[in-house]
UniProtKB/Swiss-Prot annotation:
GO terms for cellular component: cilium. Pfam families: Ank (PF00023), Ank_2 (PF12796), Ank_4 (PF13637). This is Serine/threonine-protein phosphatase 6 regulatory ankyrin repeat subunit C. It comes from the Eukaryota. Keywords: ANK repeat, Repeat. Putative regulatory subunit of protein phosphatase 6 (PP6) that may be involved in the recognition of phosphoprotein substrates. Gene3D superfamilies: Ankyrin repeat-containing domain. InterPro entries: Ankyrin_rpt, Ankyrin_rpt-contain_sf.
């Protein structure tokens, strides 16, 4: 917002500024626009309110000026009058219904503005019209916050007298008194304290009044707070005390006051830093540091990372402060948790003068730091040649010759070729840093240029990787091996080919601009190119492969260095072979995968065949499409790459990949390549077209594009499912609408006869279902829409529990309930525990449906019992479901629950529904027989708990087996005990002549043997029983009739001791539906 010239304003505004009432009246009589707006949407009334001329203001209002007009920042004339302290103008505006609660863009009301601008009279006029004086602006500040911020004692007093809250916090939890302390408004602070303000209040980050006063150097406020007895060492959320803050901000007077009042000079914060650490690092902390040292601060106190105050001074090269610390006993070679001493830190940040001071005071230049590096490693790594020279001391080596060795030893006391823990010497670091002056200093000091690190890399590898031309030339000239491979088989040429990627990130000053980056980047690329060119000119072999089979051409392609790639292709004798080779991956694939369109263009212009495939059958075009690189797709298609080549696993083409990933632009390019008329309908291994994949992944733009380009909307995959089926599953309304707009057939069926309406119902997509039903009416209103198993959409909605879809289907065609499979929607709902849809069906269609039967004669109550659905059972019985109804096998819901071991359902049917436990099925099994046959002990005990009837306990089925036989055979000890205690007979024999005791035998032969043994034991059973028992035994005994086959049971099964013994009681397995 600039300053506007008065001469550029409308005549009415000029007259107002000139306070010329008659001119204003004259202009208004001439029909001058009274609500004319300037560039910031301010009206003449804003101007009059700002000037405060009541006569003009009233004239404008009476002439129809909008009293609540807002400018671009939503300020009204009332805001303007309050800001200018024009109380008469404000009174007049209020008299003419100006909105006293109007807010500007910062949510500030006229009260906020008046309080901030010391307009006491205006505030007195506004307050009676407000419900509260504690209304907050967007930052959470009240009028009292603004008044305190302005330091106006009279305004503060007025607001307090009118009920302003002392403890109201803004959005950073700062109270008005925080601002008084921070801005040094001592009298205001005293008033607030006298009115009861909390002098120990904290904001959201834990800052107290003492912290804020210390930060801004408000010495008088600090003294007053200390006199009030505030806690001097109270930490904020970061553990910093007021002394920490004062030292960090360089407020030496405040720091002095705090120290004199007894502040702890050695109190650490959350990271272990003391005030001395802060004083050592801050811009203006020199006097604070001296004060702390003179008052007993521990100069060797280490933070949680092991940094001493001397480390902190070394970061920013605080020379004078480092001298003070050293003179006061700071440990020169104190190491942090990484092993770095202050000398390492000074070398890392290039502070030569500080290095001199540290070395003069005995700092160990051979001390190992991070990764076992010397300070010299760090100095040369970051390219500080002056520091390098200083650390090399005299810069000259002398030889110590003995009978055992002939080593170069530095005068500083360490071997210059000593490696770090990764095997890298100082020369490696210098080569990586790229400062040729450092490199020359080390070489002249005897550094070994052939030394390899743990990765097998020489300094030349590092120089090449960083694209450092001068360092590369220096090392090669000095005799470095140009084709030496590292542990991965990479030569310096491999790294040079990808040098722009491997280049170490350099530090820039904080005020660097983006405009400086482009020339710098261009300069680096040129240097990297010259480096590569130099290596090639000096014998580097471009045909050498690393251990994975990649040449320098592969590296250049993978990292997108077009100039490097062109140079390598030009210099390589077998370049075409390298480019076309797909072992392990071709350069074309690498460039496409990484989205390097310039490199890709170079390769495309070199190659004849762009459709070479990798081991998975993917072409470069497929990879570019899959990765969403439209530029690469454009390059490849313009050079003739095919969009129809399929990869091996799913048989996807680039079109499939583009559609599945939603890469619309790439898809457009592929279609426009015009390889085939039906290119959009190409199918994968499952028969899916790109349209189907686009819809499955909800890519609407791709769907529209494919349909516009001729993709067949009704194309079906190998399971007969179309794009419309997929749209119904995903629920994408836009995709579905696009398909219907292109005449997709709504009632198309898959291999199971299911339509998209079935899928929408099953997935619960209400709006999709509504759209499909409407479309189906116009297609074939008589189609019953049942699948090949007879299930309708209503079956699926009920089974899946989608109430809204079921409601729509019932509204659409309530008679659909009776169509299709007799296993009704109600059966489906209760068997899947969908009580809400079950209740909806009963309420909509009446109680008559609760006793409907499926093909096996089973009612919904059978289904609920099978699923152990108690709520379903309750619902059905509430609507007169028949509790003892039987299916075609003669089984009741209780029998169904017993057979499947559903204890809760059995308990409910027995105790609540009073189900009949004596009902027999077609094989004369009771519920007790069925529970025992499947080993459901709890169910059997529940049934036994309801009866003492010997007729039921000793009831035999068509195989003459009692519950005791079956319980014994299945090892149900507690059930056997319960049966025996209720009088179950132990001598009854089944069809095979076996008693319950013999039923415990693992197989028939064992049972027969056990029977023979028992027959010879005393006491004997009654004579009749013996003869009957012996007859049956001999008839079936394996000894007496080895070749006799076991007779069939009444239900057609074989011997009850066969592998599937449960068939002896005529069960038909689990509930098949």
């Amino acid at each position: 917002m600039g300053i506007l010239s008065i001469t550029d304003q409308p005549p009415l505004v000029q007259a107002i500024f000139n306070r010329d009432v008659e001119e204003v009246r004259s202009l208004l009589n001439q029909k001058e626009n009274i609500n004319v707006l300037d560039q910031e949407r301010r009206t003449p009334l804003h101007t009059a309110a700002y000037i405060g001329d009541v006569a003009i203001l009233e004239l404008l209002i009476l002439s129809g000026a909008n009293v609540n007009a807002k400018d671009t920042v939503w300020l009204t004339p009332l805001h303007r009058a309050a800001a200018s302290r024009n109380e008469k103008a404000l009174h007049l505006l209020l008299k003419h219904s100006a909105d006293v609660n109007a807010r500007d863009k910062y949510w500030q009301t006229p009260l906020h503005v008046a309080a901030a601008n010391r307009a006491t009279k205006c505030v007195e006029a506004i307050i009676p019209l407000l419900s509260t004086v504690n209304v907050a602006d967007r930052t959470g500040r009240t009028a009292l916050h603004h008044a305190v911020h302005s330091g106006h004692l009279e305004m503060v007093n007025l607001l307090l007298n009118k009920g302003a809250s002392l403890s109201t916090c803004d959005k950073k939890d700062r109270q008005p008194i925080h601002w008084a302390a921070f801005l040094g408004h001592l009298e205001v602070l005293k008033l607030l304290v006298a009115r009861g303000a909390d002098v120990m209040c904290k904001d959201k980050k834990g800052y107290t009044l003492l912290h804020t006063a210390a930060a801004s150097g408000q010495i008088e406020v600090v003294r007053h707070l200390l006199r009030l007895g505030v806690e001097i060492d109270e930490p904020n959320s970061f553990g910093n005390t007021a002394l920490h803050i004062a030292c960090y901000m360089g407020q030496d007077a405040v720091a002095n006051e705090l120290v004199n009042y007894g502040a702890n000079v050695n109190q650490p914060n959350e990271k272990g830093f003391t005030p001395l650490h802060f004083a050592a690092v801050s811009t203006n902390g020199a006097l604070c540091l001296e004060l702390l040292v003179n008052n007993g601060a521990d100069v060797n106190f280490q933070s949680k990372e092991g940094k001493s105050p001397l480390h902190m001074a070394a970061i920013h090269g605080r020379f004078t402060r480092s001298q003070i610390l050293i003179q006061n006993g700071s440990e020169i070679d104190c190491a942090d948790k990484y092993g770095n001493t202050p000398l390492h830190v000074a070398a890392r940040y290039g502070h030569e003068l500080l290095i001199s001071t540290l070395m003069t005071n005995g700092a160990d230049t051979a001390r190992r730091g991070i990764h076992d590096m010397f300070p010299l490693h760090l100095a040369v790594l970051f390219g500080f040649s002056d520091c390098c020279r200083k650390l090399l001391s005299s810069g000259q080596l002398y030889s110590i010759v003995s009978s055992l060795s002939n080593e170069h030893v530095l005068s500083a006391g360490f071997d210059i070729n000593t490696p770090d823990n990764l095997g890298r010497t100082c020369l490696h670091a210098a080569a990586s840093g790229g400062n040729v002056e450092c490199l020359n200093l080390l070489l002249s000091s005897g550094a070994d240029l052939r030394r390899r690190d743990k990765f097998g890399r020489t300094p030349l590898h590092y120089a090449a990787a960083n694209g450092s031309y001068q360092c590369t030339v220096t090392l090669v000239t000095a005799g470095a091996s140009i084709n030496e491979a590292d542990c991965k088989g990479c030569t310096p040429l491999h790294y040079a080919a990808a040098s722009d990627t491997y280049r170490r990130a350099e530090t820039h000053s904080g005020n660097s601009h983006d405009t400086d980056e482009e020339p710098l980047k261009e300069s680096r690329m040129k240097e990297a190119f010259f480096c590569l060119e130099f290596l090639l000119d000096n014998g580097a072999d471009p045909s050498l492969r690393d251990k994975q089979g990649y040449t320098a051409v592969h590296y250049a392609a993978a990292y997108g260095n077009r100039q490097n790639l062109e140079l390598l292709l030009e210099m390589s004798f077998n370049c075409l072979e390298d480019v076309e080779s797909t072992i392990p991956v071709s350069p074309l694939h690498l460039a496409a995968y990484n989205g390097h369109c310039e490199a890709l263009k170079t390769l495309a212009e070199t190659l004849v065949n762009l459709d070479v495939r990798d081991h998975k059958g993917r072409t470069a075009l497929y990879l570019a499409t899959e990765r969403g690189s439209t530029e690469c797709v454009e390059v490849l298609t313009s050079h003739g790459a095919s969009a129809l080549v399929k990869e091996r696993k799913r048989k996807w083409t680039p079109l499939h990949a583009a559609a599945a990933n939603g890469n619309t632009d790439s898809l457009h390019l592929l279609i426009d390549s015009g390889e085939r008329a039906d290119i959009t309908d190409v199918m994968d291994i499952h028969g899916q077209t790109p349209l189907m994949l686009a819809i499955m992944n909800g890519h609407v733009d791709c769907v529209h594009l494919l349909l516009e380009k001729g993709s067949t909307a009704d194309a079906a995959d190998k399971r007969g499912r179309t794009a419309l089926h997929r749209g119904a599953v995903t629920g994408c309304e836009d995709c579905l609408a696009a398909l219907l707009d292109h005449d997709a057939f709504v009632l198309c069926r898959d291999f199971k006869g299911r339509t998209p309406i079935h899928f929408a119902s099953a997935c619960g997509h209400l709006e999709i279902l509504r759209t499909l039903l409407q479309a189906a009416l116009s297609t074939d209103p008589l189609d019953s829409v049942v699948d090949y198993s007879g299930y309708s959409p209503m079956h699926w909605a009920s089974y899946s529990g989608h109430e809204d879809c079921l409601e729509l289907l019932l509204e659409h065609n309530p008679f659909a309930y009776l169509e299709g499979n007799p296993f009704t929607p109600l059966h489906c709902a209760v068997i899947n525990n969908q009580d809400s849809t079950a209740e909806m069906l009963v309420e909509a269609l009446g109680a008559k449906i609760v006793n409907s039967r499926d093909a096996k004669g089973r009612t919904p109550l059978h289904a609920a019992a099978f699923a152990d659905n108690i709520h379903g059972l309750q619902l059905l019985l509430r609507h007169q479901a028949e509790v003892d109804t039987t299916d075609k096998l003669g089984r009741t819901p209780l029998m169904m629950a017993s057979e499947n071991g559903h204890t809760a359902a059995v308990e409910f049917l027995l105790y609540q529904a009073k189900a009949n436990i004596t009902v027999l099925d077609v094989n004369k099994n009771t519920a007790l027989h069925l529970a025992c046959s499947k080993g459901h002990e709890k169910c059997a005990l529940l049934i036994l708990g309801e009866t003492q009837d010997l007729g039921l306990i000793n009831a035999s089925n068509s195989a003459l087996q009692m519950p005791l036989h079956i319980a014994a055979r299945n090892g149900l000890a507690t059930v056997v005990q319960a049966l025996l205690s209720r009088g179950a007979t132990v001598l009854a024999v089944d069809e095979e002549g076996h008693t319950p005791a013999l039923a415990c035998a693992p197989n028939k032969d064992v049972a027969d043997c056990l029977a023979l043994i028992l027959s010879t034991m005393k006491p004997f059973p009654p004579k009749d029983a013996i003869s009957s028992f012996s007859f049956n035994l001999l008839k079936n005994c394996g000894i007496a009739a080895k070749t006799a086959a076991c007779g069939a049971l009444p239900n057609g099964s074989t011997c009850p001791y066969s592998k599937d013994r449960h068939n002896a009681i005529g069960l038909d397995g689990c509930y098949s539906e």
